[in-house]
Amino acid sequence: MDWTAIKVITSSEAVEAVSYILTDMGAQGVQIEDAADFANLHEGKYGDHGEFIDPSSIPHRKNGAAVSGYFPQNVFVPELLPTIHQRVAKLREYGLNPGENDVSAATVDNQQWATVWQKYYHPLRVTDQLTIVPQWEEYQPADPKEKLIFLDPGMAFGTGTHPTTRLMLEALEKTIVGNEYVIDVGTGSGVLSIAAKHLGAGKVDAYDIDEVAVNSAKKNLALNPVAKDVKVGINSLLDGIHTKADLIVANILAEIIVPLIPQAYENLKPGGKFLVSGIIDDKAPLIRQKLQEQGFIIDDEQQMKDWHGMIAHKPTEVK
């Protein structure tokens, strides 16, 4: 079976959003070539976070990024290309730079798609304790504290390579003490839910508005026995959810975090933590303001490239 590869030339900051658009339009998998990722690699075998990568083996760009979605060959390309172009262009409304937004199509054979792309994915140590491993890789932990998260990166919903995901994983590692009730909003690949379980969380509920993302999360959860009891469902943010969690996490765009803030406040226990990422530079003041207006206290803020992650808590004595 041949495939239609639709490539979008974009910016590094828009990689995850463009990946989502392609998957939402029917792509069966996504390949990313990001100049920022290549620039972060050390000379030699190991990457910035201990990943096993030979830089010379990676096709790379000098600037920007290219995201390729792989579609069944029978898709109607003349209709698909302008639709993708329009959706990528609208990313400006969310504070993201769509870059060149050049969209093109080519035919690739099954061998190219099914196996060749896998050689560019390798184990990636993203935090002090967490390493993301492609499901087909055989990998042994380097030390007793290293915990492995197995993912199928073919469906690119936050696979650990983007700064927003790394910021959130680092925040989880700082925050989880043990046995917390965690809600993962906009779960995507399920990576945050899996990480939470590895770090000692108790009950974990995960939600996403997108059915494709929910199915992707379920597949990844099944690869990780530690996360076998995580519940995943389709839901828009926390609409209709009425509970009291210890920790709520969300790696989503700032414009979507804004309506989530009051919902998170209502669904947290006093003293509960709210972890957010996916916040581009110029939106960080807005999120700080909205968190504080709601009554949250911001405990920590970290930045990676142009992205921010924040840890806030609900006061124990609510006015």
From Swiss-Prot:
Keywords noted in UniProt: Cytoplasm, Methyltransferase, S-adenosyl-L-methionine, Transferase
UniProt-recorded Gene Ontology molecular function terms: protein-lysine N-methyltransferase activity
Gene Ontology cellular component terms for the protein in this record: cytoplasm
Pfam family membership, one: PrmA
SUPFAM superfamilies to which the protein is assigned, alphabetical: S-adenosyl-L-methionine-dependent methyltransferases
Keyword Glycoprotein (UniProt): no
Transmembrane segments: none
Subcellular location: Cytoplasm
Keyword field contains Methyltransferase: yes
Family note: Belongs to the methyltransferase superfamily. PrmA family.
NCBIfam families: prmA
Function recorded in the entry: Methylates ribosomal protein L11.
Protein name (record): Ribosomal protein L11 methyltransferase
Species the sequence originates in: Limosilactobacillus reuteri (strain DSM 20016) (Lactobacillus reuteri)
Name of the encoding gene: prmA
